[in-house]
């Protein structure tokens, strides 16, 4: 197959949602329809616990939540699908934000009963900033939930999206009968039996036909016709160019646990979703069809195999082909590296690949060369924009609980921070270490991993901080900046890359500081424009 055809075949996307909206279930069902797994590992209800394929760290298995982004790939209808399954747990946002830098489009999963939740709002706003095409999947229709129109309004208002339904539910919860597929013009009847892999579809192009009454009953038929008429009047018709530009978001309804509505989503997705897109580097726009390879590290995962102390750097290929055993330039370190066993993924199963194309995610064994945001090229000096650190929301001092293991603790903290699990700030005054996370559960994860992977114990103390602000003075030698440093010295720290950070204890402090020191600018992400 030609290089251009290989690029056109690829679809790399992320699935994002609030905890428990059914994201991992949806991921598994997509794999099931893609023929990549024989049966989905039950995400609840199954008597035999198979363990979901995409949750593969020990702590995820124990708690039944996805903690780190895993990469899954399969072929479907001649397309190569790469899914980045992001942690939906409210405490794993940092990793999730970064995953969004590596996807070409996104599917947002929303729980029909809970509607839009705040976690989803944050993630979708990042997608909108980047103009990433979005498809919305409203899940769990076999349960009682909000009215479909109310949900669509909520999605439009809270997420700032402009939606158009491509499928619509017939009834809901107890009365749920199935879905009318607007995109393909057919009806899917719901049987409630998840063992049936593919549900029965009835082709149905003329919604006015009296056949409809026979299939779903008189009242539901009248209601469905009214609803579809309303949809055609109120919502815009689907336009692929608008979708690709990030201005229009199609909505699908279904129940992932019951395999319902998932195939329609997948069929439409492979048809409309974008192939790998060009990406902005700091110097120029890099297009996928360029001959020379360029890629960037968006995630580092330590100890994927507890038996070996290995780290894997996940690299998204942006242009050219990545070949095994060919030397590539590590831009930040300015040295050439060769990779004898680049991995492709299928959750925990890794396979060595000889050649990868734009849109693919490759795992490279790493002995400590990589940090998040690093670039690999064939010699060109460039780095990709948009892999920032966000200000954490929780801050705690980290203390060593076992004096004999100080070295292991330092190494563990270092590696976990490289992975981007949390952020480390070192206070200027006394060099005490503060760990900042996006959610409180992260502290447990760090403690657990330090102990189980590095043999080090730690304890925490609260540290009252509202936000971390990265500091950039207009003139580092000015009297004003010196005064700022003198007054705020207790709250000044350095992040891992030695950038100066001001740990503010309230929104009021931030405002006061900004008005008192106008030439000292404060940023809430570590990547300044």
Where are these regions (language model features)?
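Structural and coupling elements of P-loop NTPases
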Residues: 1-529
């Amino acid at each position: 197959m030609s290089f251009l055809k290989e690029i056109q075949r690829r679809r790399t996307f992320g699935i994002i949602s609030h905890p428990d909206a059914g994201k991992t279930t949806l991921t598994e069902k997509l794999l099931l329809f893609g023929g990549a797994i024989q049966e989905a590992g039950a995400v609840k209800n199954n008597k035999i616990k198979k363990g979901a394929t995409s949750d593969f760290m020990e702590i995820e298995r124990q708690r039944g939540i996805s903690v780190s982004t895993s990469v899954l790939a399969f072929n479907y209808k001649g397309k190569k699908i790469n899914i980045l399954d992001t942690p939906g747990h409210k405490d794993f946002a940092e990793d999730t934000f970064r995953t969004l830098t590596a996807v070409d489009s996104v599917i947002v999963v929303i729980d029909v009963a809970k509607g839009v939740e705040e976690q989803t709002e944050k993630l979708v706003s990042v997608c909108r900033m980047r103009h990433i095409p979005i498809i919305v999947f409203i899940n769990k229709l076999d349960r009682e939930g909000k009215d479909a129109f109310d949900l669509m309004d909520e999605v439009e208002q809270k997420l700032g999206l402009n939606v158009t339904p491509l499928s619509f539910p017939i009834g809901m919860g107890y009365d749920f009968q199935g879905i009318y597929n607007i995109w393909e013009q057919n009806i899917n009847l719901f049987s409630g039996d998840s063992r049936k892999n593919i549900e029965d579809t009835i082709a149905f192009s003329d919604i006015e036909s009296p056949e409809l009454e026979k299939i779903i009953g008189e009242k539901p038929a009248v209601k469905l016709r009214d609803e579809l008429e309303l949809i055609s009047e109120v919502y815009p018709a689907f336009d692929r160019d608008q979708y690709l530009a990030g201005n229009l978001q199609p909505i699908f309804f279904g129940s992932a646990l019951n395999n319902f509505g998932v195939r329609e989503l997948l069929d439409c997705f492979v048809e409309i979703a974008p192939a790998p897109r060009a990406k902005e580097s700091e110097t120029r726009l890099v297009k996928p069809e360029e001959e020379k390879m360029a890629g960037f590290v968006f995630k580092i995962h330590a100890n994927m195999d507890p038996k070996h102390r290995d780290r894997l750097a996940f690299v998204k290929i942006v242009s050219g082909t990545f070949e095994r055993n060919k030397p590539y330039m590590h831009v930040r370190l300015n040295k050439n590296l060769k990779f004898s066993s680049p991995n492709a993924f299928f959750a925990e199963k890794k396979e060595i690949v000889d050649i990868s194309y734009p849109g693919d995610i490759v795992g490279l064994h790493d002995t400590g060369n990589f940090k998040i945001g690093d670039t690999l090229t064939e010699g060109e000096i460039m780095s990709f924009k948009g892999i920032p650190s966000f200000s954490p929301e929780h801050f705690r001092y980290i203390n060593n609980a076992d004096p004999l293991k100080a070295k292991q603790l330092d190494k563990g903290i270092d590696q976990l921070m490289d992975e981007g699990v949390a952020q480390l700030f070192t206070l200027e005054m006394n060099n005490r270490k503060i760990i900042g996370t996006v959610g409180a559960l992260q502290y447990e994860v760090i403690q657990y991993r330090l102990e189980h992977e590095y043999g080090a114990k730690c304890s925490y103390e609260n540290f009252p901080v509202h936000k971390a602000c990265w500091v950039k003075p207009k003139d580092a030698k000015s009297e004003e900046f010196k005064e700022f440093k003198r007054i705020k010295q207790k709250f000044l720290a350095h992040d891992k890359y030695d950038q100066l950070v001001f740990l503010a204890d309230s929104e009021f402090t931030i405002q006061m500081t900004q008005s008192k020191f106008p030439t000292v600018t404060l940023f809430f992400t570590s990547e300044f424009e």
